[in-house]
């Protein structure tokens, strides 16, 4: 497909005054030369008219020379140009120099076209001479009336359409191709593949076009002419991305003030400005955004919508990527699940089934049982498996890797996907590959081994077999297996034991038939790891996939995962998302190019045109300067986080599980009704709470948010709801800390007035808040109000960015991991212990791993390390006392416990001897922080726990 567009070259800026002064003598010589040449041309016709025999004498030798050149033998031909060609080239060069000089003298004059279609002034005589020797060329209807002065040698693609067979022109359209009425979208094409000469790139199905404009730039045509490509794309606004990419965000930045990486200045990429709707062209390490107008035509081996571009970049910091039409790169391991037989069956292709990725074919309905001689081998296999179990160390650190999920193949929401997580990987390593380690004769009977493996898997204890549930499919109406990694369909009813290929991993929402142990539930999935910036550099982004990966690994190292019920997540449906967010917000951030094919094209076209992204300094794309966006994976990860928290909350509310911890990302408590900000797209905790309300699973719900940033999205969602009590402990600094909301006087509205409690810490980091301040807030404000509210379920936005180890822009507080564990224990005294923690913020890997470990240990009821003596005995700082006093004063008219504290201020802060006059007056006015009065409101069985020394 020829994509050349007649476009004028960019006008060069006027030279500097110093250069003009140096060029004046040269211009004068040029003007004199041109004047003499024009005078000579004007005198030449007069000489020809006065002396007619002279042209004949002059033409004679030229005519004879031309005849000799035309009739020269092939063996005598050379590359030396004739005098006529030299003269013609000299005239063309002279004319170009004259045009360049005129543009320099008059910079504001309109530029000349890229190629002059009119004949040159001096070619009339030459054409008359050559017309008698050169045969006439038949003209085509599409040719201009005059031939080009200099025809390019590589011009075959210009004539490609003329000789295209009529049969290919009349071929019907492939049903798998994108509909013409579908909204326009983008295709990300990695720049490395354009210039790569490796075999992997040379065999790419989508090889691009071979027009002269592309081939004239060498081996890397697109990267060598970024400006020209940008001008071409600007002329095709109907097919460019339906969103603009501003460079400045109007939303507040959560990372404002963070120091840039050391190498930020050295490798920062520069992007030419191409207008408000222009594409973004990056460096050789930045993917290019190409519209569908530049995609190869259909009719190849694969439809243009399904032609991948495989990129193997060993020098990059990220994993190998697979780029498909869209904006985001795919990890290489997802390529196998994307190119499934089911998706390519409509194109008429028959790909052979790879035996390395598929499993053995299931037996027929009349398959006989294993023969008798195989019994000794089965016993030997059983012994070998037991030896492997005994040799495995529970404290050994597992190897974390991203396992491909079939969830990405689900383009509509709601149903749980066939996703494999790290827990399943552990199971497969222990029970899916014993034949590779056993004796050689056993490898000849894979079917028998699969039967034995499944029989052994049913006998192994729950904690040692992994974190997911493998159940054979029931006979009858079962859900069909995903075709991503399974072999061809098997008969519905089998008399023989079902092999492992007929076992599927059930998500947490599909396991109600199995009785879950009444313990702590953990939820995690590798789908959420794919939400990454296209730059591949995690050091530039505080919120990255390594956060949940590190937490999941820490829980495995400490043996906590084996004590919990590890569940599978699911993707939240669009209807569930719309219970909190607007339809526009859900369609913008809850769909990807694959899932949009099943939605209303007319509605999507208008919404996508309103979507705005920003260009990040790293070269990626984001909703704002903090929140990165990956067109293929961000929507799936955000929906998976929301669905996982919702599913875990339902299991705890129905008492299938005692409590739970959701290791999810991206976070959600900053996402409000129609805005994504602060790393958040969908408010997972708010969605779970709303779903519990709509399905009458809980009448009163308490949401505690101890993230150092205020949960503005959660507060906005339930600001007028009296059935949801929202309590937030956050750094406020009088509105000068992100996101700026969460003041003490924000207490709710309407019927929900008083059900919004903000413990807004003030005073900055002089000194920073720590364990004494958070313990005082929990004992003075959080727990008394929560007991008076008496919730049925407790949801916790468990952000750990208040933990020690975070820089000042991301928190700067010094809360210990033991304090987070203690606060979790306190919340378990509410709602019968029905507590669900969902990971929110926290970006220091060591801090969030320690805090998560302490919280999970508290949920399990294990012995938590006691707080330090300093944390118990040290009194809160003056800024914290003032903040707590403000909360008591504001909420004294809504809660009885706060009213009693406000009426007796002298009873909860003792006098501090030896303090200066100002501090003594403040402390005397604010009263004591003793917990003696609080003991009157607590049940008798809790007095023993509260009698710990609290000399604050």
UniProtKB/Swiss-Prot annotation:
The modification Phosphothreonine is found at residue 286. Residues 197-212, 482-503 have a biased composition (Low complexity). Residues 877-952 are annotated as: Interaction with SIN3A. Changing residue 358 to A: Abolishes nuclear export. Residues 49-149 are annotated as: Interaction with MEF2A. The record marks 843 as: Contributes to catalysis. Its EC number is 3.5.1.98, 3.5.1.-. CDD domains: HDAC7 (cd10008). One of its GO terms (biological process) is regulation of mRNA processing. Changing residue 181 to A: Abolishes nuclear export. Changing residue 486 to A: Abolishes nuclear export. A motif (Nuclear export signal) lies at residues 917-952. Residues 130-224, 261-283, 349-377, 389-441, 460-510 are annotated as: Disordered. It comes from the Eukaryota. It is an enzyme of class 3 (hydrolase). One of its GO terms (cellular component) is nucleus. Residues 218-546 are annotated as: Transcription repression 2. Residues 1-268 are annotated as: Transcription repression 1. Changing residue 155 to A: Abolishes nuclear export. Abolishes phosphorylation by MARK2 and MARK3, interaction with 14-3-3 and localization to the cytoplasm. Pfam families: Hist_deacetyl. Residues 360-374 have a biased composition (Pro residues). PANTHER family: HISTONE DEACETYLASE 7, HISTONE DEACETYLASE HDAC1-RELATED. Interacts with HDAC1, HDAC2, HDAC3, HDAC4, HDAC5, NCOR1, NCOR2, SIN3A, SIN3B, RBBP4, RBBP7, MTA1L1, SAP30 and MBD3. Interacts with KAT5 and EDNRA. Interacts with the 14-3-3 protein YWHAE, MEF2A, MEF2B and MEF2C. Interacts with ZMYND15. Interacts with KDM5B. Interacts with PML. Interacts with FOXP3. Interacts with RARA. Belongs to the histone deacetylase family. HD type 2 subfamily. This is Histone deacetylase 7. It comes from Homo sapiens. The lineage of its organism: Eukaryota, Metazoa, Chordata, Craniata, Vertebrata.
């Amino acid at each position: 497909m020829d994509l050349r567009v007649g476009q004028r070259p960019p006008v060069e800026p006027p030279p500097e005054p110093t250069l003009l002064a140096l060029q004046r003598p040269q211009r004068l010589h040029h003007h004199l030369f041109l004047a003499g040449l024009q005078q000579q041309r004007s005198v030449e016709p007069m000489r020809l008219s006065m002396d007619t025999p002279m042209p004949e004498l002059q033409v004679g030798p030229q005519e004879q020379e031309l005849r000799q050149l035309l009739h020269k033998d092939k063996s005598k031909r050379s590359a030396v140009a004739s005098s006529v060609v030299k003269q013609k080239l000299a005239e063309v060069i002279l004319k170009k120099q004259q045009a360049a000089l005129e543009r320099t003298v008059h910079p504001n004059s309109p530029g000349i076209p890229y190629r002059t279609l009119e004949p040159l002034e001096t070619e009339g005589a030459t054409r008359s001479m050559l017309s008698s020797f050169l045969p006439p060329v038949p003209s085509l209807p599409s040719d201009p009336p005059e031939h080009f002065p200099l025809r390019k040698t590589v011009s075959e693609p210009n004539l490609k359409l003329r000789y295209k067979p009529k049969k290919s022109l009349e071929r019907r359209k492939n049903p798998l191709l994108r509909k013409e009425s579908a909204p326009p979208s983008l295709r990300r094409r990695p720049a490395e593949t354009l210039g790569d000469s490796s075999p992997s790139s040379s065999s790419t199905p989508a090889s691009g076009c071979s027009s002269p404009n592309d081939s004239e730039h060498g081996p890397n045509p697109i990267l060598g002419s970024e400006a020209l490509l940008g001008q071409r794309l600007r002329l095709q606004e109907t097919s460019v991305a339906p969103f603009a990419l501003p460079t400045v965000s109007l939303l507040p930045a959560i990372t404002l003030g963070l120091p840039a990486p050391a190498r930020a200045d050295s490798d920062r990429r520069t992007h030419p400005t191409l207008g408000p709707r222009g594409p973004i062209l990056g460096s050789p390490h930045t993917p290019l955004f190409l519209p569908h107008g530049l995609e190869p035509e259909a009719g190849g081996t694969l439809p243009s919508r399904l032609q991948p571009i495989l990129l193997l970049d060993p020098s990059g910091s990220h994993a190998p990527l697979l780029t498909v039409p869209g904006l985001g790169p795919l990890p290489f391991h997802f390529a196998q699940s994307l190119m499934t037989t089911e998706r390519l069956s409509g194109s008429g292709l028959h790909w052979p089934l790879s035996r390395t990725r598929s499993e053995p074919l299931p037996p027929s309905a009349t398959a006989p049982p294993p023969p008798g001689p195989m019994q000794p081998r089965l016993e030997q296999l059983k012994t070998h498996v037991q030896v492997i179990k005994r040799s495995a160390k529970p404290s050994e650190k597992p190897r974390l890797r991203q396992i491909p999920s079939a969830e990405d193949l689900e383009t509509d929401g709601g149903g749980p996907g066939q996703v494999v997580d790290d827990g399943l990987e552990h199971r497969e390593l222990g029970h899916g590959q014993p034949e590779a380690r056993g004796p050689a004769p056993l490898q000849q009977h894979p079917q028998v081994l699969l039967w034995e493996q499944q029989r052994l898997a049913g006998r192994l204890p729950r904690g040692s077999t992994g974190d997911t549930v493998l159940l054979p499919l029931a006979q009858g109406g079962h859900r069909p297996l995903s075709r991503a990694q399974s072999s061809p369909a098997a008969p519905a009813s089998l008399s023989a034991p079902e092999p492992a290929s007929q076992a599927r991993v059930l998500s947490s929402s599909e396991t109600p038939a199995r009785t879950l142990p009444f313990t702590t539930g953990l939820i995690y999935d590798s789908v959420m790891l794919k939400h990454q910036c296209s730059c591949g550099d995690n050091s530039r982004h505080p919120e990255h996939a390594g956060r949940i990966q590190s937490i999941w690994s820490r829980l495995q190292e400490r043996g906590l995962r084996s004590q919990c019920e590890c569940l599978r997540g699911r993707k939240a449906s669009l209807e569930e998302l719309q219970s909190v967010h607007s339809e526009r917000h859900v369609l913008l951030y809850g769909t990807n190019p694959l899932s949009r094919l099943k939605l209303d094209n007319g509605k999507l076209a208008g919404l996508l045109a309103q979507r705005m992204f920003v260009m990040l300094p790293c070269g990626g794309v984001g909703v704002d300067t903090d929140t990165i966006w990956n067109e293929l994976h961000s929507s799936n990860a955000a929906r998976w986080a929301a669905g996982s928290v919702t599913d875990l909350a339902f299991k705890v509310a129905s008492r299938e599980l005692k409590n739970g911890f959701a290791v999810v990302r991206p976070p959600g408590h900053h996402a409000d009704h129609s805005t994504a900000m602060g790393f958040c797209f969908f408010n997972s905790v708010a969605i779970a709470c709303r779903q519990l309300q709509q399905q009458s699973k809980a009448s009163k719900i308490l949401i505690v948010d101890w993230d150092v940033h205020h949960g503005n999205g959660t507060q906005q969602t339930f600001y007028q709801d009296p059935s949801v009590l929202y309590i937030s402990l956050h750094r406020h600094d009088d509105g000068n800390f992100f996101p700026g909301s969460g003041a003490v006087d924000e207490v709710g509205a309407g019927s929900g007035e008083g059900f919004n409690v903000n413990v807004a810490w003030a005073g900055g980091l002089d000194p920073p808040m720590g364990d004494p301040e958070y313990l005082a807030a929990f004992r003075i404000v959080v727990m008394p109000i929560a007991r008076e509210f008496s919730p049925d379920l407790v949801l916790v936005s468990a952000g750990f960015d208040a933990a020690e180890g975070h820089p000042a822009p991301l928190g700067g507080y010094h809360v210990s991991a033991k304090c987070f564990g203690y606060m979790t224990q306190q919340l378990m005294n509410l709602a019968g212990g029905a507590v669900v923690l969902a990971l929110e913020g926290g970006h220091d890997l060591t801090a969030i791993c320690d805090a998560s470990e302490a919280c999970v240990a508290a949920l399990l009821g294990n012995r938590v390390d006691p707080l330090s003596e300093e944390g118990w005995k040290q009194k809160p700082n003056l800024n914290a006392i003032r903040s707590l006093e403000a909360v008591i004063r504001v909420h004294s008219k809504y809660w009885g416990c706060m009213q009693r504290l406000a009426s007796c201020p002298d009873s909860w802060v003792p006098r501090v001897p030896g303090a200066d006059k100002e501090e003594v007056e403040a402390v005397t006015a604010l009263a004591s922080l003793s917990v003696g009065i609080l003991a009157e409101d607590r049940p008798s069985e809790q007095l023993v726990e509260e009698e710990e020394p609290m000399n604050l």
